[in-house]
A protein has these predicted regions:
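Membrane-embedded transmembrane alpha-helical bundles that form the catalytic cores
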Residues: 1-494
Length: 495
């Protein structure tokens, strides 16, 4: 069930909200949310609800064991030393990564073994469960936080179930860290201010997805997949670039739109998830970009992989090795395809170069910092080419499209396809470019200053009405677009 589907907007969401707020007490509300979340998942994956329940039960058990092995008042545990706790973590990782590996990578491994060694192994043909990359990572987060003493283990399996399966973040994130919402599972206090802020966030996310991402998806698909050219090598340089830029905008508004909707839904039920995006396309370096893009995944790998491997505490060579491990895993996390592996290693190269420059050539590293526009242009060039690799069906398509972008095939500079797409989508392109900028925080800061100088009555009320009118218009336009049956799937549902 998609957040941007009629079934969700007109059926599941209003019914769930109504029942939730009619129920008395935190316990009943939590149980209902878990039941609603399992129904939400079963709507698209009825068979894999059993896999979800196995993931919940397994991580609940590993969490209890992690808490037990931390106890210092049990003499027989002291005699065993740290090994039971470590073995428990190894088994937990094997359990979660085993689930992820079998369903996500089995076909990829079999295919590569057959091609490399001339084998005839049968492809298991397993269907990828929606959201498995997210809920397995959340399960690991829960157990690791308990193991580290950063959170208390839950005695009730239903509480762990709610954390893992809560429907706003279940399908495509953000990856919610257990220690960030542990207290809110049974100690949150819903209020109308949070609810209203959640509705605002949800509408903004819906607008990003339906009004912007879906339109750019159509541009990217037509050109990337060669539907507009008899011979893809005839694609003009400008057309190749407009396809790459369209996908760059599509994936941002698609994924950040989903994240906004997830954060908004969480707020409606009293949960405060950490933001997942912070205007990544204004970044002045590749390192800065990854501090702003998919922040829940970046921080997960930082805290659970990079730092345990030694982080920045060891010498530069070891830091580079740690960085390599993180970005190899990041690429694989996104999918069972060599394009994702290369995409991860592509970013590793740039991040490693930036790290080396900061350590060994600080003056060179500071040059881009002194010229923000230059730093942003270089970063966006790296990002756009990276998205071409990410979007391509295979490495040959990625190499071909990048070659077309730089005219290495002798393809023309421009053509009628580029001209048509620019004229047809000029308004969306302009709106998207503005929406990528952090204008809203600047506007809020300016309004705060005006409130101080002129008083809230002079500024806050009329601008508040204007904001509400804009949100209402955005909602109506999004619903109208959905009524037309426009392009709708979320990109990160595939991961």
């Amino acid at each position: 069930m998609l957040f941007s589907s009629v079934e969700f907007l007109c059926g599941f969401l209003p019914f769930t909200l109504m029942v939730y707020y009619l129920l008395p007490g935190r316990r009943l509300r939590n149980r209902f949310l878990l039941l609603a979340s399992l129904f939400f998942y079963a709507w698209g994956e009825p068979l894999y609800v059993l896999l979800m329940l196995a993931c919940i039960a397994g991580n609940y058990t590993f969490g209890l064991l992690a808490a037990l092995f931390r106890r210092q008042d049990v003499k027989w545990l002291e005699k065993l030393g740290p090994w039971p706790a470590r073995l428990n973590i190894v088994l937990m990782l094997a359990f979660n990564l085993g689930l992820l590996g079998v369903y996500k990578y089995a076909g990829f491994v079999v295919s590569n073994l057959n091609q490399s060694f001339g084998l005839q192994l049968e492809d298991p043909g397993l269907v990828l469960p929606i959201g498995i990359s997210f809920f397995t990572f959340q399960g690991m987060s829960y157990v690791l936080d308990v193991f580290r003493g950063q959170a208390q283990a839950r005695r009730n399996v239903l509480d762990v179930g709610l954390y893992v399966a809560f429907f706003p973040q279940l399908i495509a994130g953000p990856i919610v860290r257990y220690n960030t919402i542990a207290k809110e599972i049974d100690g949150r206090r819903e209020n109308w201010r949070d609810f209203a802020a959640g509705v605002d966030l949800f509408i903004i996310g819906l607008g990003k997805k339906v009004l912007l991402a879906n339109n750019f998806a159509l541009i990217a698909e037509k050109i990337f997949d060669g539907a507009t050219y008899d011979n893809p090598l005839e694609m003009a340089v400008a057309a190749a670039w407009i396809a790459a830029v369209a996908y760059t905008l599509q994936i941002y508004f698609d994924f950040s739109g989903y994240s906004d909707m997830a954060l908004g839904l969480g707020r409606m039920f009293g949960f405060h998830f950490l933001p997942n995006f912070n205007y990544p396309y204004v970044a002045r370096s590749v390192t800065d970009f990854w501090r702003r893009w998919h922040m829940s995944l970046s921080s997960w790998f930082r805290d659970y992989v990079y730092i345990p491997l030694g982080g920045n505490r060891l010498g530069l060579p070891r830091q580079i090795v740690n960085l390599f491990a993180v970005w190899l895993l990041t690429g694989l996390w996104h999918g069972a395809n060599w394009t994702f592996v290369v995409w991860g290693l592509y970013y590793f190269c740039f991040l490693a170069v930036e790290k080396i420059c900061r350590e060994k050539l600080p003056k060179l590293a500071g040059l881009l910092g002194k010229i923000p526009l230059l730093g942003n242009l270089v970063t966006m060039l790296v990002v756009i080419i990276g998205w071409v690799i990410f979007r391509s069906a295979d490495l040959s398509q990625a190499v071909q499209h990048i070659g077309l972008m730089f005219g290495v095939y002798g393809n023309p500079l421009t053509d009628e396809i580029f001209t048509f797409q620019m004229l047809e989508n000029r308004v969306q392109l302009a709106v998207a470019c503005v929406a990528c900028l952090p204008l809203l925080p600047l506007l809020k800061h300016g309004l705060h200053r005006l409130h101080v100088v002129l008083g809230r009555g002079w500024v806050g009320v009329p601008l508040g009405v204007l904001r509400d009118c804009c949100l209402l218009l955005m909602l109506l336009l999004a619903l109208a677009a959905l009524a037309k049956g426009s392009y709708n799937p979320f990109i990160y549902f595939n991961f």
